[in-house]
């Protein structure tokens, strides 16, 4: 069996940074699956469509190319909302599922998202669910956006993050939740180095090879 590390969790919990560092430490390719949904949402918005429309989302999936996933404007609040809406569409999730599984199956991988351990790679030998308090996550996302020069109002962002959490947890297909055998890592009071150290210990315990 290849080493597959599934890293799930809500927005701004630190899963992306952690996944990248784990991939580097264990010599594995990394896939931020959230970028796939962000790219689909971005395409819908650019076309003046409705991210909640199955037809608009299906069109965006059909024209998705790798370059779209590399765009620099995928991590802004309006795309956060669009990504959450298209991700609730079963047809979109099904269309992107094979891509994610193929990526993981090649040589092992680190994948981060919201349903890696529960749906995409349910047999992954290492599953992490990274979380943090709502306030900690809000402050991290504010800092991230402002460091990139994105103008954002704190209360509006708070409301949007809360709404996304609720949508992700309540959707019928692949709701956000820890896998039964996932290790929960609360990063509320951890910096990036501390979170990585704890995650690395979990991986080496689960995969002592």
Swiss-Prot record:
Family, per entry: Belongs to the cytidylate kinase family. Type 1 subfamily.
Recall the GO molecular function terms of this protein's record: ATP binding; CMP kinase activity; dCMP kinase activity
Top EC class for this record = transferase
Tagged with keyword Kinase: yes
Q: Looking at the UniProt record for this protein, which Gene Ontology cellular component terms does it annotate, in alphabetical order?
A: cytoplasm
Task: Give the Enzyme Commission number.
Answer: 2.7.4.25
Note the coiled coil stretches, chain numbering.
Answer: none
**Subcellular location field:** Cytoplasm
Which reactions does this protein catalyse? CMP + ATP = CDP + ADP; dCMP + ATP = dCDP + ADP
List the GO biological process terms: pyrimidine nucleotide metabolic process
Keyword set includes Lipid biosynthesis? no
Name of the featured protein: Cytidylate kinase
The entry's ATP-binding residues are 9-17
Per UniProt, the keywords (alphabetical) are: ATP-binding, Cytoplasm, Kinase, Nucleotide-binding, Transferase
């Amino acid at each position: 069996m290849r080493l597959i590390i599934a890293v799930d969790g809500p927005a701004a919990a630190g899963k992306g940074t952690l996944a990248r560092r784990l991939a580097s430490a264990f010599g594995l390719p990394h896939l931020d699956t959230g970028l796939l949904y962000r790219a689909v949402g971005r395409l819908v918005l650019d076309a003046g469509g409705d991210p909640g429309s199955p037809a608009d989302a299906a069109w965006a999936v059909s024209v998705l190319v790798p370059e779209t996933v590399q765009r620099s404007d995928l991590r802004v609040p309006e795309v956060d909302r669009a990504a959450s809406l298209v991700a609730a569409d079963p047809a979109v999730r099904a269309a992107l599922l094979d891509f994610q599984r193929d990526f993981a199956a090649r040589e092992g991988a680190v994948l981060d998202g919201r349903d890696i351990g529960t749906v995409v790679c349910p047999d992954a030998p290492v599953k992490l669910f990274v979380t943090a308090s709502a306030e900690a996550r809000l402050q991290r996302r504010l800092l991230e956006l402002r460091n990139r020069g994105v103008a954002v109002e704190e209360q509006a962002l708070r409301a949007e993050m809360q709404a996304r959490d609720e949508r992700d947890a309540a959707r019928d297909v692949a709701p956000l939740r820890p896998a039964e055998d996932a290790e929960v890592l609360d990063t509320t009071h951890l910096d990036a180095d501390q979170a990585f150290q704890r995650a690395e210990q979990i991986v080496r315990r689960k995969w002592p090879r």
